[in-house]
């Protein structure tokens, strides 16, 4: 379902992308080429800042937003999802947030007020809150990463983890 606000802002979805009929896209959402948005996903850019301004939620080409994912932006802040990025079932991305290209987020992952670099893998049931995760980092399942985390303790993405995330992206893009 595509929803607009009283000002007339409406989501923009590229013709080559697929949005499941049960998904909800609200207001300032931009969906680029060959994006898959699965059942019951909610992508909402419908809050304004103190000046009445609202940044968009941008989803990069060839990305997939799976079943039940919520992407939302606090007080008009931007959310940018890079190209070839996979966000698995029931994950939450809450802006302000920037996600690089080729990133994988496992199911039930929570991201809030963070920047996640290119090629990162954040496994299932993990939280990244209030920090910047450099390119190529690997967050194991059930970990909580925040401003208190010593990033020197975070491993780099392995070839297996990278291949898995790329395979998920390819599989879901085949659906578009």
Tell what function each PLM region has:
Residues 2-12, 40, 44-46, 50-56, ...:
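Glycine-rich hexapeptide-repeat left-handed beta-helix
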């Amino acid at each position: 379902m595509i929803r607009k606000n009283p000002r007339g802002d409406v989501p923009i979805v590229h013709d080559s992308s697929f949005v499941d009929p049960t998904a909800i896209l609200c207001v300032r959402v931009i969906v680029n080429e060959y994006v898959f948005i699965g059942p019951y996903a909610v992508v909402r850019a419908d809050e304004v800042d103190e000046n009445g301004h609202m940044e968009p939620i941008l989803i990069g080409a060839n990305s997939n937003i799976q079943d039940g994912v919520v992407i939302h932006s606090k007080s008009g802040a931007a959310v940018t999802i890079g190209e070839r990025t996979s966000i698995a079932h029931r994950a939450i991305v809450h802006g302000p947030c920037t996600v690089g290209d080729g990133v994988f987020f496992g199911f039930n992952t929570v991201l809030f007020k963070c920047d996640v670099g290119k090629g990162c893998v954040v496994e299932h049931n993990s939280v990244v809150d209030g920090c910047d995760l450099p390119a190529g980092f690997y967050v194991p399942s059930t970990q909580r990463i925040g401003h208190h985390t010593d990033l020197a303790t975070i491993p780099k993405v392995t070839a297996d983890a990278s291949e898995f995330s790329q395979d998920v992206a390819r599989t879901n893009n085949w659906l578009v």
